[in-house]
A protein has these predicted regions:
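Short coil-to-helix segment of the ABC ATPase nucleotide-binding domain corresponding to the Q-loop/switch region
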Residues: 99-107
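Hydrophobic anchor residue at the start of the ABC signature
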Residues: 153
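The feature captures the beta-strand-to-loop junction immediately N-terminal to the Walker
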Residues: 45-47
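Conserved ABC ATPase "signature" region
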Residues: 110, 117-135, 187
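Conserved signature/switch motifs of ABC ATPase nucleotide-binding domains
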Residues: 138-141, 159
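ABC ATPase NBD coupling module
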Residues: 75-92, 111, 116-120, 237-242
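Helix-to-loop junction immediately C-terminal to a conserved catalytic motif
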Residues: 60
């Protein structure tokens, strides 16, 4: 399978995007230009405080830009959110403890007015997709962190959004669980081919998952470079041992070093309300 999806029609177009947090008079993002094609898996990586999460949330209409434009399928980001074009997964699973796995996944479908039979069928499909069949009646507190994130992913994808926004979804997990979920996420993506925007601090994770890696500079966040990832899909555990994989990791690392990734998080404080 080709590393680049055959459908290259733009699904997200960002032009001249700048975000200033006025309370701290800090420019988090400056003059961002970026197009995302349908079915791409694009990772955003950069030093702490560079605006990765801010950019993702501007795309999802969770943060309003100071200037510039974001269009999604030819619509404003606001209209795209109203039309449910987005599914969003955060670092914390954000599940409701009093609802079972089944009912957590079904929540957006209830809000959209799906009838009970259609919800039941869709939840069955999604639990199978994220390999949680048999856990439908468990509550979040009965699940591991990795299983909770699978529920969160299933819920985000349940209503078939065109775009999946993921803000460091595996950042709090141990390395073994993280690598296993990387494989599971790619399996899901290869089946559904939603456009994925993925924020991470891990170079190897970004290279392993993505069709392209967008490297961001320290504040004010700009695009320092874009690295096409020409590793074939499906990717496996052996992909991480491939010589080309190491070459691409080195390419991304060098871009980060050139743009100041040596800065520690405490050397790049965030303004009030600013996101990473």
């Amino acid at each position: 399978m080709s590393a680049v999806p055959p459908d290259t029609s733009p699904v997200v177009s960002i032009s001249g995007l700048t975000k200033t947090f006025r309370q701290g008079n800090v420019t988090a993002l400056q003059e961002i230009d970026l197009d995302l094609s349908a079915g791409e898996f694009v990772s955003l990586i950069g030093p702490s405080g560079c605006g990765k999460s801010t950019l993702l949330r501007v795309i999802g209409d969770l943060v309003e830009p100071s200037s510039g434009t974001v269009t999604v399928n030819g619509k404003t980001a606001r209209q795209a959110r109203i039309d449910r074009d987005y599914g969003i997964v955060f670092q914390d699973a954000v599940l409701f403890d009093w609802r079972t796995v089944r009912k957590n996944i079904a929540l957006p479908l209830e809000m959209l007015g799906w009838d009970r039979e259609k919800r039941r069928d869709r939840v069955r499909e999604m639990t199978a997709l994220v390999e949680l069949t048999g856990f439908e009646d468990h509550h979040p507190w009965q699940l591991s962190g990795g299983m909770q994130q699978r529920v969160s992913i299933a819920r985000a994808l349940a209503f078939e959004p065109a775009i999946l926004l993921m803000d460091e979804p595996f950042g709090a997990l141990d390395e073994m669980t993280r690598e296993r979920l990387n494989l599971e996420l790619l399996s899901i993506w290869e089946q559904l081919r939603s456009t994925v925007v993925f924020v991470t601090h891990s170079i190897s994770e970004a290279v392993f998952l993505s069709t392209r890696v967008v490297v961001m500079s320290p504040r004010p966040g700009r695009i320092a470079g874009i690295v096409p990832i020409d590793l074939p899909y499906p990717r496996t555990v052996e992909t991480r041992e491939n010589a080309r994989f190491f070459e691409l990791v080195t390419t991304v690392r060098e871009l980060l070093r050139q743009r100041g990734e040596h800065l520690l998080p405490e050397e790049a404080p965030r303004a009030p309300g600013e996101l990473r």
